[in-house]
């Protein structure tokens, strides 16, 4: 029974994990809207708004869509980036 729980937990973690990458071209499953660019950032596929700079989390409010699911905007390296939560 414990093995079944562990396997189920591992399947859930793998299912919810973000798409990993080493270059922008590796991001095949991440889809950004027209006003954002797809970018591989620190090994994770993200959507980024290159036109808008940020200095705090308050500058990047609201939700976004990544992998067809809802994510949240975060201010990382002075850019608003969409990350899966």
Curated annotation (Swiss-Prot):
Annotated localization: Secreted
Gene Ontology cellular-component annotations: extracellular region
Molecular functions per Gene Ontology: serine-type endopeptidase inhibitor activity
Tagged with keyword Coiled coil: no
PTM info: Contains 6 disulfide bonds.
Cleaved signal peptide residues: 1-18
Keywords: Disulfide bond, Protease inhibitor, Secreted, Serine protease inhibitor, Signal
UniProt superkingdom: Eukaryota
Tissues in which the protein is found: Detected in hemolymph (at protein level). Within the digestive gland expression is limited to the basophil cells of the digestive diverticula.
Keyword Disulfide bond attached: yes
Described function: Slow-binding inhibitor of serine proteases. The inhibitor rapidly binds to the protease forming a weak enzyme-inhibitor complex, and this is followed by a slow isomerization forming a tight-binding enzyme-inhibitor complex. Active against subtilisin A with a dissociation constant of 0.18 nM. Active against perkinsin. Not active against thermolysin, papain or pepsin.
Official protein name in the record: Serine protease inhibitor Cvsi-2
Annotated organism of origin: Crassostrea virginica
Encoding gene per record: CVSI2
């Amino acid at each position: 029974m414990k093995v079944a729980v562990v396997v189920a937990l591992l399947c859930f973690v793998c299912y919810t994990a973000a798409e990993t990458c080493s270059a922008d071209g590796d991001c095949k499953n991440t889809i950004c809207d027209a006003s954002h660019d797809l970018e591989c950032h620190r090994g994770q596929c993200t959507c980024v708004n290159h036109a808008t700079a940020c200095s705090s989390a308050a500058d990047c409010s609201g939700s976004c869509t990544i992998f067809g699911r809802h994510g949240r905007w975060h201010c990382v390296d002075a850019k608003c980036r969409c990350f899966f939560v």
